[in-house]
Amino acid sequence: LILAATVWLVNEPESNTYFGITSFLYVPVGSYDRNDTLNLGENRWKHTLQAGYITGLTSNISLDLVGDVTFFGKNDELGASKATLEQDPLYQLQGFLRYNVTPQWDLRTGISHTFGGETQINDINQDNDLATTKMTIGTAWFANPGLQLIANYGSDLSVENGFKEQHRLNFRILK
């Protein structure tokens, strides 16, 4: 379960300038059994604080800049030994350019860098800080004012301590 709310500190549609802060609270409601290898839940709370800035560079081109930090609660029932899992904050910086072909349709490209998030098990550092840089190109279309369809292709440019995605295709429907 993810609870989210945004506070708009700047909301100026006439100049296409926006600045908002969003808080995401991840509630541990999935099933979790420390003896299972795979669990749907993490048995811990998470909180992400995200700041996003959008500005129109021209009448058809927008720049989106987003930064966020995720804080993790601890899981004190990790594995059969009931170890304690703790995690350092995880940071992400994103930048996107969007070109509005029409008011309903845009083309977009972006870059993202995620870093941090080292874990500790029973206070022993796991030396697993993440550092991932990825690129995305895509398109979005408002089929009607309440329905947006998004398609993005992406690839990881560099990965430290994780799996590298050569190709990724994402489809989103927002209503």
Regions found by a protein language model. Give the residues of each.
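Hydrophobic alpha-helical segments and helix pairs
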Residues: 1-43
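Residues on the lipid-exposed face of transmembrane beta-strands in outer-membrane beta-barrel proteins
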Residues: 3-9, 23, 49-55, 69, ...
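Transmembrane beta-strands of outer-membrane beta-barrel pores
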Residues: 9, 25-31, 55, 69-73, ...
